[in-house]
Amino acid sequence: METLLDLLPRVERLGSREALRFWNGYRTWRWSYADLDAGIRRFVAFLDRKGVASGDRLVLWSENRPEWVAIFWACLARGVQVVPLDHQSSADFVSRIVDQTGARLLVHGGAASPVSGAECFAIESLNGLTIGPRFRPTPVSGSDVVQIMYTSGTTAEPKGVIHLHRNICTNLDPILEEIDRYKK
C-alpha cells in the first residue's frame, strides 16, 4: 500500500456492512460503509465548491463522531492536510493553530465556538450537504502529508508533528496482511 487512498475502494465495495458505531451518551449511531461513502462524497463536493485543494490545510476541531471520519477521508481524497485537535482545546489555542498552519477551513463541533482566521464549518452540517458525484481522488504519493498532529505540550509549547502517507501505511500494512489472511 503506497497511500491511505489505496483503502478507499474498500469503502465502496463493503456497502451496507457496518463501518462505524458511535455512542453519544444517549443512543448508539451506526454508519454503514455506504453512509461513510456518502459522507465522504458530500464533503469532497463541498471542498471542491470552496476551492480547498491539494496542499491546503483544514483544522478538524470536534468530538469523535462518524462525520469526523468522513471529513478526514474526504480531505485525504483531495490531498488536503488535516490538523486534528482535541475538542476540549480552547478557542485561543485553536486560533493560534489556525494561524500557524495557515488553515483555509476550520471544521468545528457544535459545542466549540468558531474562531477567526479561517472559514468555519459546523460538523453537524455534513448530512445537510448535497451528495457529490463519484470522484477521482487527487493523486498523492507516500511522501505527501496526511495530517499534522499537535503534541500535548507537556514540557513545552505544543508542536505540530507531520505524518506522511508512507509513515501511516508502514504501520497499516502488517495489520491488513493479517486481516486478509484470516478472510481466507
What spans do the regions from the language model cover?
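A short N-terminal helical cap/helix-turn-helix that marks the beginning
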Residues: M1-L20, A38
